[in-house]
């Protein structure tokens, strides 16, 4: 099985907020929702009013597998190579079920998204178009309305009979050498929401159940890899057993765990072969939340040569020895649990901030992941209900005046974001370029005069990136960069013009050069 790795660019989407592919068949749409605990859907709630605002946050908007399948061509043309939908398993809860993370039936596609056949068709169609699919799974907890909890035969399947224990939301607890056993247990045994129930991960039957379920979904759908939700909340040895079982049945299949922590030491602890672990994890890939923390703020700063702006990026990458396999880190600007990279529409006017961040994401080490709408300047901040960063994708729902799928009605700013994203993604996908970035060694220079210079090199072929992190024009002497400037001219990827390399090179404010020497 072909899996996902640093050669790929992953596109994360929330099916309910992506596209409604059944809106032109109202009878079928009603049937998909009929009999569900939450049988409402409306993509057009006015979230600015108090009543509709709450409804918009809680209620489904009607996106489905048919919509996902119908717009695979958009993703292929954009230039991504892998699709990661949030969970599609049944979430038959009274409210707040659209996100997919409180599962009621682990062996059923939520009928409001479609059927198992629809899911398999989506994966098959993606494969035909050269796209891979990541399966999103939740093994720490299920819905409190699941028959597994509500009708449980054996209470030992769950951490507690009553749901009084709430997790302490301290995912670093298991890697902290000094933390009390009480705090560690509260992390693993506590539920996330009042609507969920935490599995007893130490129970062998529970382990068998979630292992068999993972194998079943991979076998049935043909997915290329797995993303595991809330990985550090699970019992360490139980997850090792889970990973071992997946690898035995699907050798080489990548598994990435959500490691939502700002400490690189805490994140590294969960990756296979970690140099900081006191026990051996079997998880191949982890999520680079520490880098995301830096990117969210560093590109708002004026870069100096010691502490701020791009210097923070350079210094963080310089600490990569903390990770056993830096190339297996999933890197990202936004996702469904945090602020979008563009937090407000007004902030989005600074398109150079996004362009520099995307350039970094697509050319440094790791497995880059985009969040739906990044490419058209979707903005929003996380709030209590996570509404801000989970809006509808423009063009996915009836009545949308803006249609990003068809490039209709986009503002000048949205179009500029889209064209830049598409340009870089399709360039990165070119076979020769792709190998250099995914497999090549990484070389960087210290930031000088606010300019960060780094390169990827493989088998004598090189790509060099230069970023001006200041709002001033700078002229730099090229002699110190001879190791990453191997010829007297190069193709600049963004402008598609050749640049002659003399004794000096001038960069405008917040400028970007991507120099292809191949």
Sequence positions of predicted segments:
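C-terminal beta-strand-rich structural cap/linker in extracellular carbohydrate-active enzymes
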Residues: 9, 501-518
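Solvent-exposed beta-hairpin/edge-strand motifs
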Residues: 480-496
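Short, flexible loop/turn elements at secondary-structure junctions
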Residues: 14-17, 89, 107-113, 139-141, ...
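Soluble or luminal CAZymes and related metallo-dependent hydrolases
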Residues: 60-67, 114-118, 205-210, 234, ...
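Hydrophobic faces of well-ordered beta-strands that scaffold small-molecule active sites
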Residues: 9-11, 83-85, 133-135, 226, ...
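Substrate-binding/active-site clefts of carbohydrate-active enzymes
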Residues: 2-9, 14-221, 239-250, 265-266, ...
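Active-site-proximal helices and loops of the catalytic beta/alpha 8
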Residues: 123-131, 141, 146-149, 213-215, ...
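Loop/helix patches that line or flank the sugar-binding groove of alpha-linked glycan CAZymes
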Residues: 3-6, 21-56, 60, 261, ...
């Amino acid at each position: 099985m072909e899996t996902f790795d640093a050669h790929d660019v992953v596109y994360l989407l929330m099916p309910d907020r992506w596209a409604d592919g059944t809106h032109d068949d109202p009878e079928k749409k009603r049937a998909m929702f009929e009999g569900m605990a939450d049988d409402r859907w409306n993509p057009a709630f006015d979230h600015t009013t108090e009543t509709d605002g709450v409804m918009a946050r809680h209620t489904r908007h009607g996106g489905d597998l048919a919509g996902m399948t119908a717009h695979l061509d958009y993703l292929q043309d954009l230039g991504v190579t892998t699709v990661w939908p949030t969970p599609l398993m049944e979430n038959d809860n009274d409210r707040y079920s659209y996100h997919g993370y409180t599962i009621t039936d682990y062996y059923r596609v939520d009928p409001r998204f479609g059927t198992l056949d629809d899911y398999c068709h989506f994966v098959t169609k993606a494969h035909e178009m050269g796209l891979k699919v990541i399966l999103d799974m939740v093994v720490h907890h299920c819905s409190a309305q699941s028959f597994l909890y509500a009708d449980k035969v054996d209470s030992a399947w769950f951490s507690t009979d009553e749901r009084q224990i709430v997790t302490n939301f301290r995912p670093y607890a298991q890697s902290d050498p000094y933390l009390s056993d009480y705090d560690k247990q509260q992390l693993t045994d506590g539920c996330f929401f009042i609507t969920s129930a935490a599995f007893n991960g130490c129970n062998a039957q529970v382990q068998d159940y979630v292992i068999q379920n993972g194998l079943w979904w991979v076998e049935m759908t043909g997915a290329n890899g797995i993303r595991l939700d809330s990985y550090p909340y699970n019992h360490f040895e139980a997850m090792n057993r889970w990973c071992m079982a997946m690898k035995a049945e699907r050798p080489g299949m990548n598994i990435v765990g959500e490691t939502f922590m700002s400490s690189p030491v805490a994140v590294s602890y969960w990756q296979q072969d970690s140099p900081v672990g006191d026990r051996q994890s079997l998880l191949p890939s982890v999520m680079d939340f520490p880098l995301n923390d830096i990117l969210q703020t560093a590109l708002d700063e004026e870069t100096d040569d010691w502490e701020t702006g791009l210097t923070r990026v350079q210094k963080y990458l310089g600490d990569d020895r903390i990770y056993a396999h830096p190339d297996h880190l999933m890197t990202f600007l936004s996702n469904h649990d945090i602020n979008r990279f563009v937090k407000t529409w007004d902030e989005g006017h600074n398109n150079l901030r996004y362009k520099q961040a995307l350039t970094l994401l697509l050319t440094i080490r790791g497995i880059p992941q985009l969040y739906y709408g990044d490419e058209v300047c979707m903005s929003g901040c996380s709030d209590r209900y996570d509404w801000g960063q989970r809006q509808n994708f423009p063009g996915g729902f009836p009545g949308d005046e803006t249609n990003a799928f068809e490039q209709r009605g986009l503002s000048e700013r949205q179009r500029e974001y889209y064209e830049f994203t598409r340009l870089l993604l399709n360039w990165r996908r070119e076979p020769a370029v792709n190998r250099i970035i995914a497999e090549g060694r990484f070389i960087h220079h210290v930031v000088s005069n606010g300019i960060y210079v780094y390169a990827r090199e493989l088998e004598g072929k090189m790509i060099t990136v230069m970023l001006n992190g200041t709002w001033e024009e700078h002229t730099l002497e090229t002699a110190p960069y001879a190791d990453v400037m191997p010829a007297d001219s190069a193709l600049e990827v963004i402008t598609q013009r050749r640049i002659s390399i003399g004794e000096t090179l001038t960069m405008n404010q917040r400028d970007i050069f991507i120099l292809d020497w191949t």
